[in-house]
Amino acid sequence: MELPVNSFDKKEASTLTVADSAFGSEYKEGLVHQVVNAYLAGGRAGTKAQKTRREVSGSGAKPWRQKGTGRARAGSSRSPLWRSGGVAFAAKPRDFTQKVNRKMYRSAMASILSELIRREQLVVVDSLKLNEPKTRELKESLKKLNLGNVLIIIDGDDRNINLASRNMVGVSVCDALHVDPVSLVAAENIVVTVDAVKRLEERLS
């Protein structure tokens, strides 16, 4: 399939031939949901820890005798009913990782990119270079595309673009090798350079 390529310097629009497997696949909602959930789950620390009544500090003696005090009966000061007592169903450290193999991950990424193209939320540009890390220069370039909140995907690490976009609200920059499904799904619009498209195609093939 062919994608239209926009240019900031010249008016003539060109096209870029890409693989259907990477940018023209059908949208698999169930797979995308599974991969996104697995990615988010993998980011959880899983370090939450609470103490049970067995682990919390305190005496094991009965606080007062069973009958005759007028108070409610109590067998331990470490009861979950008591202040500073243990937790009834205490949370323990756990691993939230969900298994997703490479084939599933690549298929989900291709599915998301293809759907973004169909919705016209993905714009390909020939290049995006800044002579200096100036926010104004980047803002003027993006203004020509008439986009709101945008995720910029570039090939490699461009210091000028990273610095220029740092204080722009609604603009984020990501390398094509490290872009993830959550960033793609959350993005309102996406601007991708030609080099980044080729890198994504290699990554998903």
Curated annotation (Swiss-Prot):
Q: Which PANTHER family match?
A: 50S RIBOSOMAL PROTEIN L4, LARGE RIBOSOMAL SUBUNIT PROTEIN UL4M
One Gene Ontology term of the biological-process aspect is: translation
Cite the NCBIfam families for this sequence: rplD_bact (TIGR03953)
Asked whether the keyword rRNA-binding is assigned, the reply is: yes
Which InterPro entries does this chain map to? Ribosomal_uL4, Ribosomal_uL4-like, Ribosomal_uL4_dom_sf
Q: What does this protein do?
A: One of the primary rRNA binding proteins, this protein initially binds near the 5'-end of the 23S rRNA. It is important during the early stages of 50S assembly. It makes multiple contacts with different domains of the 23S rRNA in the assembled 50S subunit and ribosome.
Task: Report disulfide bridges, numbered on this chain.
Answer: none
State a single Pfam family of this protein.
Ribosomal_L4
Q: How does it assemble?
A: Part of the 50S ribosomal subunit.
Q: What is the lineage of its organism?
A: Bacteria, Pseudomonadati, Pseudomonadota, Gammaproteobacteria, Legionellales
Alphabetical list of SUPFAM superfamilies matching this protein:
Ribosomal protein L4
- Per the record, which residues fall in region Disordered? 44-79
Q: What is this protein called?
A: Large ribosomal subunit protein uL4
Which key words are in the record?
Ribonucleoprotein, Ribosomal protein, RNA-binding, rRNA-binding
Any single GO CC term annotated in Swiss-Prot or TrEMBL for this entry: ribosome
Q: What HAMAP family does UniProt report for this protein, alphabetically?
A: Ribosomal_uL4_B
Cite the Gene3D superfamilies for this sequence.
3.40.1370.10
The record lists the membrane-crossing segments as none
Q: Which terms does the record give in the GO molecular function aspect?
A: rRNA binding; structural constituent of ribosome
Family statement = Belongs to the universal ribosomal protein uL4 family.
